[in-house]
Amino acid sequence: MLNHQSTYKIQNATLGFKEEIERLKVQAAMSWEKEFRLLKWYGLQNGMNVLEVGSGPGYVTEHLLQRLPDSYITALEIGKTLQNHAKQLLNGYSTNRIKYVEASVYDTNLPDNSFDFVIARLIFLHLYHPLEAAQELFRVLKPGGRLVIIDIDDGIFGTVNPEIPSLHNILMKISQYVSQRGGNRLIGRSLPRILINSGYIDIEIDSVIQHSDVHGIDGFKRQFDIKRLIPFYKNGVITSEEFEQMNKAYEALNHSAEAFAMMNYIVACGKKPLSI
């Protein structure tokens, strides 16, 4: 059996499988245009051999297939349930366009020096050993190839209107709880160092800002779905007062025309040297 070494397993999703899949679908679409613009700026081109790690249910994979019609996409995902969903979603695409690999990001079983570009979106925050993952992706990249990591940092998560007075404290409590279980919701600030320590050069770091007035409110409703916080409340991670503040924000996002939200992703890129 494959060892996940990760805090994310869809069977443990608080929302349940169907709602979690829908959340991932909306999440993939919200800032895709801005993310793709950055990917191109980092060097992603049509015709490249592309690896997407942590490809999940296939929604980002579908965007890549649509925008890179001459590229071959390898979708690596350790979760069989998620990969089966991706195969159903993308069954109209030829096997000449896409390959599915069920493997760990720590041990991909892929050949050395085989990919022009690797994309790791919202996976590093879950990994017990992010440095090992970055080193494995370094191995499979061609010399001159690039790894782009898109992830979060709850220290600069974003903001909500109406304001949640305890939002930062709530996020820090949840981050600490996740950290004790092997994840890192503050991973964004560490991405340049992870890349440097894995051998990458020409490090770049940027951010992708999402705003409900620009990207739609639906994704933020799902991000702030109060059901996602119930386990943290039940386990004593957040107080009843903090839970109620988040619940009021969730209700406002669903019912108030005055409500809005802004959220931030960190994007880091590193290049494998031409000679090692």
Question: How should each PLM-predicted stretch be described?
Answer:
Residues 7-32:
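Class I SAM-dependent methyltransferase Rossmann-like catalytic core
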Residues 148-216:
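Conserved catalytic/acceptor-binding region of the Class I
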